[in-house]
Amino acid sequence: MILKDLYEITENMLLAAGVESHKFDTDCLFEDILGADRVTMTLHGDREVPEKDADRLMSAAEKRCCGKPLQYILGRWEFFGRPFCVGEGVLIPRPDTEVLVEKVLEHFKNSGNFSPEICDLCSGTGCIAVTLKKELPKAIVHAVELSSEAMPYLIKNIRLNEADVKVIKGDVTDSLLIENFADMDDIGEYRKIDAVVSNPPYLTDKEMEELSKEVKCEPELALRGGADGLKFYRIIACLWREILRDGGLIAFEIGWEQGGAVKDILEKSGYENVSVYKDYAGNDRVVMGTKKADV
């Protein structure tokens, strides 16, 4: 079978299966599996495709038709211009999260602190932690993750991007984890850091019931945020405040309807200068504030 005919068959398969991004997905599969980008398709569309390669392509297309996320099929996805390995058991990096990273970087640029100590909670692939370390080379960055399924991806992505990120396996809602982290300083007091950053699970129970078949493939542990979606914001804002310096930054990615609620949580938990920022689609996406000085 020639390249252009295989392309047409693949795209029509995805279209018939209801894949909205059928053309984009077909392009990605062809480039990844056959090494055929749009230029190749235009110039060499009559090229014969070896049967084993066509079979691999069809197998991948069938998985996509059944709802498996494109990113899981490819095994990698880009975030902030860098590659990250992904697969079943880890949340797929999304453009919305880049807004969180941009705002955190902007904060430290404006403050003149280019060597902050940062904790990325619910790290998953490590896309936030790795990006912050690469963009702030003098920073000390910790990535905290509970999931045994996500942990191999986190470690792999740190190595892939040659980022000196320190990995901590643990539950961000466990006060013992924070106490153990604070004890690393050996000074008899809570260790103080400059920022807590997190894209925590924030979907409500109702939203979990209405997920697309693609998102249902992603780990529930990384998605479900309790009945109202705010469980992790409440806990992190309270527990992790103890190891933030006075004036230290807390920054969250949020669901598009959660801006007011998360802002209220932070203000009631001892933070000031709390602001809500929008993503490029105009939806509330990030909430940031700074720790009030303890009196």
Q: Which ranges hold each PLM region?
A:
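Mobile active-site "lid"/loop adjacent to the S-adenosyl-L-methionine
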Residues: 202-231
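Active-site beta-alpha loop architecture of Rossmann-like, nucleotide-cofactor-dependent enzymes
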Residues: 71, 203-206, 257
